Design a protein with these regions (language model features):
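Conserved acidic donor-binding segment of nucleotide-sugar-dependent glycosyltransferases
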Residues: 160-171, 179-184
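A short, well-ordered alpha-helix in the C-terminal region of glycosyltransferases
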Residues: 186-198
Length: 198
């Protein structure tokens, strides 16, 4: 039983070599998500452009170039970042976040709902391949546009250019984050499309 088709296709041949019994069925399932826990946020402050990333406390959940990406994307107003799930291991990997990026260890410091209320975009480069990321469901329900890696479960969850952005390299992350900061009408349209898809 697999969470997404890409992982099923990758692992099925390997497992069939271990046991080629034709009665074994390799299946995927449609996960359940409780949308009411993450209400859609139509209006966010215009005083700054809110961006962030959220995960459990694990250094691998951060790409080594995370701070470079956050620093170099442009916005017409001040940027305000929020890293939820940030601890000493994360700091040792990526360095000390800039003064405009707030860090929180876990949801006791900043709730998930407050995180999404802050974020126009979830700018989430990682060094892991996500299988079927819960963050995607939460962001899409909340109206935070996803700017994520072009691999793993993100490919099935995000429709590139319509419900979010799939990034293959550092330049993609910087470009699409900048695009979302500078094109609020497109960002709003994408947030609505993601909400409908989710």
């Amino acid at each position: 039983l697999y969470q997404n088709e890409e992982v099923r296709q990758k692992n099925m041949p390997l497992l069939k070599r271990c046991n080629d019994d034709p009665t074994i069925a390799f299946m995927t399932f449609k996960p359940y998500f409780h949308n009411e826990s993450f209400p859609f946020i139509e209006e966010r402050t215009q005083e700054y452009f809110g961006c962030g990333r959220i995960s459990r406390q694990d250094a691998d959940k951060f790409a080594a170039n995370t701070l470079h990406i956050y620093e170099y994307f442009v916005a017409p107003v001040f940027k305000r970042g929020l890293f939820l799930g940030f601890d000493q291991r994360s700091r040792e990997k990526i360095g000390e976040p800039y003064g405009w990026i707030r860090t929180a260890r876990d949801q006791r410091e900043v709730s998930q709902q407050d995180f999404y209320k802050h974020c126009e975009i979830v700018l989430q480069p990682t060094d892991t391949t996500e299988n079927w990321p819960r963050v995607g469901f939460e962001a899409m329900a909340s109206g935070s546009v996803l700017v994520v890696d072009n691999r793993g479960g993100w490919r099935q969850m995000v429709e590139h250019g319509k419900t979010g952005w799939l990034c293959s390299n550092e330049r993609d992350f910087i470009y699409y984050a900048s695009k979302m900061a500078c094109e609020p009408n497109l960002r709003d349209d994408m947030a609505e499309a993601a909400r409908a898809r989710g």
